[in-house]
Regions:
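Contiguous, often N-terminal, cationic amphipathic patches that form binding interfaces
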Residues: 2-69, 78, 84-85, 89, ...
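C-terminal catalytic core of tyrosine-transesterase DNA break-rejoin enzymes
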Residues: 75
């Protein structure tokens, strides 16, 4: 099942479509752009069904996935072990679980660059 459908089924009212509350944390639906010029979470006025994230690493030997996990761990000031790639290991469309975070925590961290 595609990441967007997964989020739509599990999302609670009032949250951005890319964010899903789960037991023990939250999940993010992410569209990853490898081989970008910078590592960044793309700022958007209105978030879509997926959070767009760019990494400089190529999509080879899981390098882009590792860069994604590092970037999210830095942004959310947590250990890399708290960031789990749940689905989409070989796709640009991914589901990431952030263990120990609330939806409010995530939205606050995304708002503060």
């Amino acid at each position: 099942m595609h990441g967007q459908n997964y989020v739509a089924q599990m999302n609670k009212p009032g949250l951005p479509p890319f964010l899903t509350v789960q037991s023990g944390g939250v999940s993010l639906a992410v569209k990853l752009q490898p081989r970008a010029s910078t590592n960044e979470i793309v700022a958007q006025r209105e978030f879509g069904a997926e959070l767009r994230i760019k990494v400089t690493a190529p999509p080879v030997d899981a390098a882009a996935n590792e860069a994604l996990i590092r970037l999210l761990a830095e942004r959310f000031d947590c250990p890399r072990s708290a960031v789990q790639l749940v689905r989409g290991h070989t796709s640009r469309h991914k589901i990431i679980k952030l263990h120990g975070f609330s939806a409010d925590d995530v939205l606050a961290k995304l708002a503060n660059k």
